[in-house]
Design a protein with these regions (language model features):
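Hydrophobic positions on the alpha1 helix immediately C-terminal to the Walker A/P-loop
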Residues: 69, 73
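Conserved lysine of the Walker
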Residues: 66
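Structural recognition of the conserved hydrophobic beta-strand(s) that form the central parallel beta-sheet
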Residues: 149-155, 176
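Pre-Walker A adenine-sensing motif
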Residues: 36-51
């Protein structure tokens, strides 16, 4: 029997999968699709259960799992599920363009779907809406009608919807989806919830992790650096455990991104592709900052700015901006033309490097500097948890990898791939500066959990526990009794 995984049984729980048949000529190819648990499911279900007259617009890079998750939840929660894909159905867009009112819009929907729309029991999923921008404007009238629920989705939404003049304020909720974060990856690989909760407790109480579990979690994190979080790639790994299959799937996604560049921005195609192709080498440089002169000796940021924005808005790249000082709010001191550019998925980044990097990561080859992939994983994790990305660099004080804001306080983070994780002069400099008033910092590495003054040394996999605190209920009623009219 083929060995499905190398992780011990006490870390594992049962995985659910379905078999899909693909008919190609006379051949039937069976492929195993694992039901990946996604955190976005909770937000989508909350929307489906709400009584608000709003639509939900789900954004995210191509192939992060938007369409699959919406279909699964829509069919599970609604008697009638209608899907219209504006990329596959070119006539659908023209039908909406010609609609003049809510009645004609709904008639067009019913005609395109070739099914009756059941009031209060129908979810209408409009996919690839970047191909029909008019529907985003028209959604206000559809949700005001109140008889049907609407979810909109598509790839490159940040790019293609920038120029819409009439975005329906107050009629749309928004949700960003990303590749699987590390916790989702752990669950996909069968790590039990009790193990994750035990690790979370260790993180919150600053207690060392059991050495056996710590060692195996590091192995799983190394696998994450190679596989990444793109659902198709994760499913391919779970089905075969074959890294060659993983790399082929990743290469396919990278090529799809490049085709999108040619299709959606042909005028700036060469600039965008050049920047995209430079990301791995720039991250492998000493300071990891994107050096503009690599693009052109006479580089002017204004000339290339839209190309950088395209990669960001398409969800392909994650810019991390330099700030002048580690003070809250960080956005006020960011420098827009000084940044690092990470890939949206660490597995895709690893696939863009040559020389069997994947094997070297998994074997822990000491001669290789894994700093770029470790930092990319950190950028990806922080982004998935809703943090804008910043770093600090100062000639006198040095550079700190990431700065985040938690509860209004700046929290610096260093990412260390080697054994010298306690060496961090720049971090020491800003912690000792009383003007910055920084109370806590993290150093993430392969070491077990420990503390030293303001610094928490945590295992790299515990990045999954860095979260924004949810706002608590704050009921406040001012005393305005003297202002009220006498009754």
């Amino acid at each position: 029997m083929e060995k499905r995984t190398k992780y011990p049984v006490f870390l594992m729980k049962k995985r659910t999968n379905i078999l899909q048949s693909n008919f190609t000529g006379d051949r039937i190819a069976l492929r195993c699709i694992y039901m990946l648990k996604r955190k976005a499911e909770k937000d989508i279900v909350n929307f489906l259960n709400s009584t608000d007259k709003k639509a939900l617009l789900i954004s995210g890079a191509r192939q992060v799992g938007k369409t699959f998750l919406i279909r699964e939840l829509g069919k599970r929660h609604y008697k009638s599920f209608v899907e219209i894909n504006f990329l596959e159905n070119k006539t659908a867009g023209s039908a909406f363009e010609n609609a003049t009112d809510t009645k004609s819009l709904l008639f067009s929907l019913s005609a395109i779907a070739k099914t009756e729309l059941i009031p209060n029991q129908t979810l209408i999923f409009l996919d690839e809406v970047q191909e029909c921008k008019e529907i985003v404007t028209a959604i206000k009238f559809l949700v005001e009608d109140g008889r049907y629920k609407f979810i909109l989705s598509g790839s490159l939404l940040g790019v293609d919807l920038r120029d819409i003049k009439s975005v329906p304020v107050g009629y749309m909720d928004y949700l960003d989806m990303y590749p699987l974060d590390f916790e989702e990856f752990c669950i996909a690989n069968g790590v039990s919830e009790s193990i994750i909760e035990n690790l979370r407790e260790c993180f919150e109480t600053k207690s060392p992790v059991n050495e056996t579990i710590h060692s195996q979690m590091l192995e799983l994190f190394k696998l994450y650096l190679v596989v990444g979080g793109m659902p198709a790639v994760v499913n391919r790994y779970l089905a075969t455990n074959n890294l060659a299959d993983v790399i082929r799937e990743q290469n396919s996604i990278v090529q799809a991104y490049k085709r999108d560049i040619s299709k959606y921005d042909p005028e700036n195609k060469l600039y965008i592709e050049e920047i995209f192709d430079l990301i791995p080498s720039e991250l492998n440089a000493k300071n990891k900052r994107f050096i503009m002169k690599k693009l052109n000796d006479n580089f002017k940021f204004s000339r290339y700015e839209n190309s950088f924005l395209w990669l960001k808005d398409a969800g392909v790249a994650l810019p991390t901006y330099c700030v002048d000082e580690p003070r809250s709010p960080l956005a006020l001191s960011k420098t827009k033309n000084l940044f690092k550019l990470f890939m949206s998925d660490v597995g895709l980044l690893a696939s863009m490097y040559m020389n069997d990097l994947q094997v070297k990561i998994l074997s822990g080859e000491l001669s290789v500097n894994f700093g770029s992939v470790y930092e990319n994983a950190a950028a990806q994790e922080l982004t998935a948890h809703g943090f804008p990305l910043y770093y600090f660099n100062n000639k006198k004080q040095g550079e700190v990898d990431f700065l985040t804001e938690i509860n209004g306080e700046v929290v610096p983070m260093e990412i260390k791939s080697g054994k010298d994780y306690t060496v961090h002069s720049a971090l020491n400099n800003i912690l000792s500066n009383s003007e910055y008033n920084i109370n806590k910092a993290y150093v993430f590495s392969t070491a077990n959990l420990s503390t030293d003054g303001k610094i928490v040394y945590a295992p790299i996999y515990m990045l999954m526990f860095i979260k924004k605190h949810e706002p608590k209920d704050m009921i406040y009623r001012p005393n305005i009794s003297r202002l009220l009219a006498n009754k």
